[in-house]
């Protein structure tokens, strides 16, 4: 009597494991990024940052596995080119989050960048003219999320291209409200925090 029960139990467990395998999607093998006219930084796997790619870079970027391009340039910065059309012609998804200089590095744009990154399916390229705004906005986003300390977020931003925008990010992180958010990840506020 025990043997049929044990056999049925093992069979049921095996079928359960096999059913679970059907829904598991294997992660794509990492692609080697072909050469482009610009330096592509990789502050973390699946996230590329850069200055302005040339029109003929999009095919190489797509071949390297990127699926989404997030452009932080403000309207009018890129004259005589339709970047959205170029990106889409290469088979990539295009997202525009206009960040006008260091002053455009703010909480609203950090939230917009977080939403765009979360919505992306696969590797992402985030760019501006030089990578400076990209690194600054990524640093602010990471500090505000509470996943990194402010210093870790600043280091992450530097690895993504932040240079002169670091002063703006530091200003936001040391302001009373910014300090409170960075310390708590936006959850319970310590005494004295708004």
Could you say what each language-model-derived stretch is?
Residues 21-124, 139-194:
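Cys-dependent protein tyrosine phosphatase-like superfamily
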Residues 125-135:
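A phosphate-binding catalytic loop at a beta-strand-loop-alpha-helix junction
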Residues 1-9:
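Bacterial N-terminal signal peptides that target proteins for export
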Residues 8-19:
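Bacterial N-terminal signal peptides
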């Amino acid at each position: 009597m025990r043997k049929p029960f044990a056999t049925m139990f093992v069979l049921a467990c095996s079928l359960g494991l096999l059913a679970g395998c059907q829904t598991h999607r294997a992660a794509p093998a990492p692609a080697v990024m072909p050469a482009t006219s610009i330096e592509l930084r990789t502050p973390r796997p699946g996230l590329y940052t850069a200055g302005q790619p040339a029109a003929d870079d999009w095919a190489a970027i797509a071949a390297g596995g990127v699926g989404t391009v997030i452009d932080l340039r403000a309207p009018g910065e890129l004259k005589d080119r339709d970047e959205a059309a170029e990106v889409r012609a290469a088979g990539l998804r295009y997202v525009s989050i206009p960040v006008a200089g260091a002053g455009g590095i703010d909480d609203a744009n950090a939230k917009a960048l977080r939403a765009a990154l979360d919505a992306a399916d696969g590797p992402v390229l985030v760019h501006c003219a030089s990578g400076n705004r990209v690194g600054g906005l990524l640093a602010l986003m990471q500090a505000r999320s509470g996943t990194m300390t402010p210093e870790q977020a600043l280091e992450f931003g530097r690895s993504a291209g932040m240079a002169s925008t670091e002063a703006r990010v530091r200003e936001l992180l040391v302001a009373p409200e910014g300090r409170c958010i960075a310390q708590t990840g936006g959850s319970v506020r310590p005494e004295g925090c708004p």
